[in-house]
Amino acid sequence: GRVHDINSYDALSSDFMNDDLSDYLDDQFAGEYLDQYTLRTPKDRMPLYHLVGALDPLTDADVTDRPNDRLPVTLGEWINADGLTHLKIKLSGDNFDWDVDRVVAIEKLAAGAQAARGCSEWFYSLDFNEKCENVEYVLAFLKKVQEQSPAAYDRTQYIEQPTSRDLKAHPEIKLHEAAKLKPVVVDEALVDYEALLLARDQGYTGIALKACKGHSESLCLGAAAQKFGMFLCVQDLTCPGFSFLHSASLAARIPTVTAIEGNGRQYCPDPNRPYARAMPSMFDITDGTVGTSCLDDIGLGFG
């Protein structure tokens, strides 16, 4: 993009690319280029997914050490400070009762915090970090959550990598039944196009893209997911500063990505400060969204 003094996402057509997508994926993509699967202008704003870690306190009763860093500590404080509407909940995958209780507790806390600020719509994603032994665990978990908190179940947008990343070693694990209930997203197992196809065969209905795993690979796999009608999300692995802007630019240019993960501000906020001065809409969160329209400069859109 910088070579041609244009945004890199505008350099993905046959005018700039020597080979079509079939060279990187397969013959299903003959005659297609990445410009067909990306936007010419970034989305204006995107909801921000806030991480709720397994050890993160929900209320003051959970706080054992309150750092003197002027940041929110409890989930309720974060919701109030940033106007959060999207929460990514980390679960154990091997402690059934704890997993169910955690989601139910978060829904109870969030419902109070959101009601206090007049918000009626918010969402969850659930990340088991590949700890579930089988699909039966996922199915039983979803059933129990739906029984104990129908609202929490309804707010859940997708489930992320519930079982082992080693798809070839566990062909017996099929996630089709779980995917009938909620999109099931492949994350750690997504290493290339072959892995995407295998994950799809095993019941995954969505993929998670990470800019830090490779920009070109993310674009190609994002194109494949769109062609196959799969759910798409972009995650950032606690990337701060420049790396968060890169992740956001990817999310803002892929049409079917509806939210962006951004937890660097929670755990390592200092690297964000120089960039916040130049792009406040990306780092000063007040309504649960980031203003991605600013990512329209040459190159990747920033800096």
Question: What spans do the regions from the language model cover?
Answer:
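Catalytic core of soluble alpha/beta enzymes
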Residues: 80, 86-238, 243-244
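General beta-strand structural signal in soluble alpha/beta enzymes
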Residues: 10, 50, 126, 186, ...
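Residues that form or immediately flank small-molecule/cofactor binding pockets and catalytic motifs
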Residues: 53, 189, 264-265
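Flexible C-terminal active-site loop/helix
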Residues: 237-303
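A generic structural signal for short, non-catalytic loop/turn and secondary-structure boundary residues
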Residues: 39-45, 152, 177-179, 253-255, ...
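Short, surface-exposed amphipathic charged segments that create phosphate/polyanion-binding patches used
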Residues: 64, 140-141, 201, 222-223, ...
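N-terminal capping/lid subdomain adjacent to the active-site entrance of alpha/beta enzymes
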Residues: 1-131, 135-147, 301-303
